[in-house]
Design a protein with these regions (language model features):
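Glycine-rich N-terminal segment of FAD-binding domains in flavoprotein oxidoreductases
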Residues: 6-102, 109-117, 202
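Terminal, non-catalytic protein-protein interaction segments that mediate quaternary/complex assembly
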Residues: 21-25, 35-41, 159-161, 181-183, ...
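Short acidic-glycine loop/turn motifs at beta-strand connectors
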Residues: 49, 66-68, 134-136, 206-209
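Short polybasic amphipathic segments
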Residues: 61-63, 128-133, 216
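FAD-binding subdomain of flavoenzyme oxidoreductases
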Residues: 108-196, 207, 223, 227-234
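Loop-centered beta-sheet repeat module
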Residues: 198-199, 204-244
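Conserved small/polar residues in nucleotide/adenosyl-binding loops
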Residues: 266-272
Length: 276
């Protein structure tokens, strides 16, 4: 098994697929070393243990929403795209998401996935509670000030089986992609460009004097929509994929269309091609 880009190979002696918290405890007690596996998207070998890997593909996909407190308890193995659909149905949203909807909530937050938007914190900042099993097979709950040391725990504190996130009210998003922003113009106006709307992402191959694509996601209640021209960039007239030449069918809605936040808040849709 390899990660999405093929540069990391998983060579565990045993892959355990727990279906309960008791299964997690049993696996920990039976092994010398255990690592948890998320969506296998990481660029490095953080989850590539040669001993025992825990895969949460068979673990119950709990998404427990408390509408009054705007909090959601999410199980390991649940993908961001799945959580987004459930939250939107309850009138709620996540304050930030990554580019890809197929990454797992627990895996992405544990490894510091950042999302986009100069006004937004990284994904782990939404965590208000962590539930895990430590190396002794004991239940541990982390809240309050201890979260500062635990949110991006890199799997070192134990096997996380649930996290609770603080959500916000659902909102609509408009997405426009701009082509060929002059690189020097981008750099000289970097803060203004990247902080212009709720979420801004730049794609460049560093091969010429242009930023190939600039993806702007506008919060329809709080942002001023950009026009057809944006800092020397021009709004695309057709749907684009972040990778030039790739099939645009998997890209989220663009061309200034307005829709619920799960429709355009990531760059790609569920299901996502693992090769992208």
């Amino acid at each position: 098994m390899k990660n999405w880009s093929g540069n990391v190979t998983f060579e565990a002696n045993l892959v355990v697929r727990p279906t309960s918290i008791e299964d997690i405890k049993s696996a920990i007690k039976a092994a010398d070393k255990v690592r948890a596996l998320g969506s296998a998207h990481s660029f490095n070998q953080i989850a590539a243990s040669k001993d025992v890997l825990l895969s949460f593909e068979n673990f119950p996909k709990d998404i427990e929403i408390d509408a009054a407190s705007k909090q959601v308890r999410i199980a390991a193995g649940v993908r961001y795209g799945e959580a987004a659909i459930a939250l939107n149905a309850a009138g709620l949203a996540l304050p930030n998401m990554g580019s890809l909807p197929h990454i797992t909530v627990v895996g992405a937050t544990s490894t510091g996935t950042h999302g986009s938007g100069a006004r937004n914190k990284n994904l782990s900042a939404a965590i208000i509670k962590i539930e895990l099993i430590n190396a002794n097979g004991e239940d541990v709950t982390i809240e309050g000030e201890e979260l500062h040391a635990a949110r991006v725990g890199l799997g070192a504190l134990g096997i996380i089986h649930h996290v609770t996130l603080q959500a916000i009210n659902a909102f609509n998003v408009s997405q426009t992609v701009y082509r060929d922003l002059h690189f020097e113009n981008w750099i000289s106006n970097f803060d203004q460009v990247m902080g212009n709307n709720y979420s801004v992402s730049a794609f460049t191959t560093w091969g010429d004097s242009l930023v190939d694509q600039l993806w702007i996601k506008s919060h329809m209640e709080n942002d001023v929509l950009p026009g057809n021209e944006f800092y020397t960039g021009t709004a695309a007239e057709e749907k684009l994929h972040p990778l030039e030449g790739a099939d645009t069918a998997s890209a989220t809605e663009q061309l200034g269309s307005v829709g619920p936040w799960p429709v355009s808040y990531t760059h790609l849709t569920l299901p996502t091609n693992r090769e992208v």
